[in-house]
Every structure is written in structure tokens, then in C-alpha cells.
Regions:
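Canonical helix-turn-helix DNA-binding module
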Residues: 46-88
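N-terminal leader segment of winged-helix/HTH proteins
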Residues: 1-28
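Basic, amphipathic "hinge/linker" alpha-helix immediately C-terminal to the N-terminal HTH DNA-binding motif
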Residues: 82-103
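Amphipathic alpha-helical dimerization/coiled-coil segments
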Residues: 17-21, 101-135
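N-terminal helix-turn-helix DNA-binding core of bacterial DNA-binding proteins
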Residues: 19-58
């Protein structure tokens, strides 16, 4: 079980990752769209709308809306399953693969330890000391 410090660290990584994602140019994905995208790229077998709905425990129409948005950004592509023409397979795209690679880099950056900011009093003292030594 994660300790409080580990949990806080994970929340910090999530926050840093989400901030980087919303600040960057290009696609701005909702949490659901990101979950669908990650499931498509991190699961080894091909995904279907029905399978994604079951895995994520959301309705098929919600998955369809998320896939519509992901397809707009060319992060996934849909293809009719040749083995069962009633089923739709969700395929990866080169742009989606690049997005996942960028996401991993963003998460690594967000996970790096951050320097502790000095307290205002300590900053003033350091500035005063610096001013005295430069005169």
C-alpha cells in the first residue's frame, strides 16, 4: 500500500502531466478520451468499441464519442473487423504513437524532484547578503 508521501508524489506527477498537456499546442483531451487512448495503446490485443466500454465500465455511446474526438486528432483510426463486420476495431496511428511517446517524456519530467522554494524571509536575507558582498 502506498504511503502518504508516495501518494502525494503520484498526485504531483499527475498534476504536472495534466498541466503540461493542457498548456501544449494540439489536442486537448478529456480524462475519458485520454483513458480510451491509453487503453488502445497499452493493451496488447486489438480493441473494439464493445471491449473498451467493458474495460472502462462506460457506455458504448460514450466510447464512440471519445473515439470520434481521438480520430479527429488522428490518434486512433477505426476499421471494420473483417472477421465480424458488425464489430469495429480501433487501430493505432503514427501520430498516436508519437503522442504516447511525448506523454511518457512529460511524465518523466513531472516525476523529477523539484527544488524546494526558499521561504520569503530566507530569500530576503540571501538578497541582502548578496547586495552587501557586491558593493
Amino acid at each position: 500500500m502506498a504511503t502518504t508521501d508516495e501518494t502525494e508524489s503520484l498526485v504531483g506527477v499527475l498534476r504536472g502531466t495534466m498541466l503540461a498537456l493542457v498548456r501544449r499546442e494540439g489536442s486537448d483531451l478529456s480524462a475519458r478520451q485520454l483513458a480510451v487512448c491509453l487503453t488502445c495503446y497499452l493493451e496488447s490485443e486489438a480493441q473494439t468499441v464493445r471491449g473498451l466500454a467493458a474495460t472502462l465500465d462506460v457506455s458504448k455511446p460514450a466510447i464512440t464519442r471519445a473515439l470520434d474526438r481521438l480520430a479527429e486528432f488522428d490518434l486512433v483510426r477505426r476499421k471494420t473487423d473483417p472477421a465480424d463486420r458488425r464489430s469495429v476495431l480501433v487501430q493505432r496511428t503514427p501520430k498516436g504513437t508519437a503522442f504516447l511517446r511525448d506523454l511518457r517524456a512529460i511524465m518523466k519530467e513531472a516525476a523529477k524532484p523539484k527544488p524546494v522554494a526558499a521561504e520569503p524571509a530566507a530569500r530576503k536575507k540571501a538578497a541582502a547578503k548578496s547586495a552587501r558582498t557586491t558593493r
